[in-house]
């Protein structure tokens, strides 16, 4: 069945993520911000968390939301394609009627269509263990490179001691 998130106030971090898992989003135009503030909190998002934003946002909006953590108000969210409309409960019901969403699940394939649309997102959830292993190997590699860099600097300082004149 179609799902709609009615955002009548702030949706930060996990609340924003939960809203993105809905098929449609309608936001209060006068109150509330959407914000993925993990960048400011120093909390990295795991791949499955990132995937829903990657799947549903334009590449530029995805980059800005993830790397800058802006607070996005209603009209900006609509302009960026994050939400599908602005308004309150009346507008949500109007949106449902306009799009004829009530009967869309009647054929029994609505869920299948969504599974196909978001196959990579589902794959990210199913492959979370591999995602964690990949992240761990990347971080281990960074540690090795950092140690090698420190060693090269120490070697250079040892060899160049007393040679530099300023």
Q: What are the roles of these predicted feature ranges?
A:
Residues 1-41:
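Glycine-rich beta-to-alpha active-site loop
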Residues 6-11, 65-71:
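Glycine-rich beta-to-alpha transition loops that act as phosphate-gripper elements at the mouths
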Residues 19, 77-78:
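Hydrophobic residues within well-ordered alpha-helices
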Residues 23-24, 64, 68-70, 82-88:
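Well-ordered beta-strand positions
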Residues 27-28, 32, 78-131:
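C-terminal long alpha-helix characteristic of the crotonase
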Residues 49-60:
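Hydrophobic, secondary-structure "cap" segments at the distal end of domains
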Residues 63, 76:
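A conserved mid-domain beta-alpha-beta active-site/ligand-binding segment of alpha/beta enzyme cores
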Residues 129-166:
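Eukaryotic N-terminal low-complexity, Ser/Thr- and Lys/Arg-rich leader segments
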């Amino acid at each position: 069945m179609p799902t709609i998130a009615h955002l009548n106030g702030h949706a930060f971090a996990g609340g924003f993520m939960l809203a993105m898992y809905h098929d449609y989003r309608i936001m209060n135009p006068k109150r509330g911000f959407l914000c993925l503030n993990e960048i400011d909190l120093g909390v990295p998002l795991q791949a499955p968390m990132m995937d829903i934003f990657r799947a549903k946002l334009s590449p530029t909006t995805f980059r800005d939301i993830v790397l800058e953590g802006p607070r996005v108000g209603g009209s900006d969210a609509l302009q960026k394609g994050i939400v599908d409309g602005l308004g309150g409960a009346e507008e949500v019901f109007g949106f449902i009627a306009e799009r004829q969403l009530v009967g869309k699940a009647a054929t029994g394939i609505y869920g299948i269509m969504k599974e196909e649309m978001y196959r990579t997102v589902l794959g990210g959830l199913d492959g979370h263990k591999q995602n964690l292993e990949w992240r761990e190997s990347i971080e281990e590699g960074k540690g090795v490179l950092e140690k090698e860099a420190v060693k090269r600097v120490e070697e250079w300082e040892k060899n160049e001691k007393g040679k530099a004149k300023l």
